[in-house]
């Protein structure tokens, strides 16, 4: 499935992204389901995996393991229906720095 985009999130977020045109949606209901689904998406070679900030925080070690210093898969974290979470570091800034080598200034 190279070069495909997938959304892995709570059912409401998955529905919203699929209505917006994402064809591969994977609703998850708990951390264990999310962990298993993330591994499957990486194994299936999805290029971009969209997930929520909440799931990203829960699976931070797994995300770091799968992305490492590679450009793909790109795992993008978005707010869920409850809004954005306060974080010490911004995963998007970390992603940009890792992929293109430039640190974004706030």
From Swiss-Prot:
Gene Ontology biological process terms from the UniProt entry: proton motive force-driven plasma membrane ATP synthesis
Topology relative to the membrane: Peripheral membrane protein
Superkingdom, taxonomy of origin: Archaea
Main location: membrane
An example Gene Ontology molecular-function term: ATP binding
GO cellular component: plasma membrane
Keywords for this protein: ATP synthesis, Cell membrane, Hydrogen ion transport, Ion transport, Membrane, Transport
InterPro entries to which the protein is assigned, alphabetical: ATPase_V1-cplx_f_g_su (IPR008218), ATPase_V1-cplx_fsu_bac/arc (IPR022944), ATPase_V1_fsu_sf (IPR036906)
Compartments, record wording: Cell membrane
General function of this protein: Component of the A-type ATP synthase that produces ATP from ADP in the presence of a proton gradient across the membrane.
Record family assignment: Belongs to the V-ATPase F subunit family.
Record note on quaternary structure: Has multiple subunits with at least A(3), B(3), C, D, E, F, H, I and proteolipid K(x).
NCBIfam families documented for this protein: PRK03957.1 (NF003047)
The protein's name: A-type ATP synthase subunit F
Organism: Methanosphaera stadtmanae (strain ATCC 43021 / DSM 3091 / JCM 11832 / MCB-3)
Gene: atpF
């Amino acid at each position: 499935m190279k070069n495909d985009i997938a959304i892995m999130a709570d059912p409401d977020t998955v529905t919203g992204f699929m209505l917006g045109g994402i064809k591969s949606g994977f609703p998850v209901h708990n951390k264990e389901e999310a962990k298993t689904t993330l591994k499957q998406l990486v194994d299936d070679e999805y290029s971009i995996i969209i997930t929520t900030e909440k799931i990203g925080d829960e699976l931070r070690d797994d995300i770091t393991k799968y992305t490492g210093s590679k450009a793909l898969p790109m795992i993008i974290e978005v707010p869920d229906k409850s809004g954005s979470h306060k974080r010490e570091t911004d995963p998007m800034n970390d992603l940009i720095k890792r992929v293109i080598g430039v640190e974004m200034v706030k």
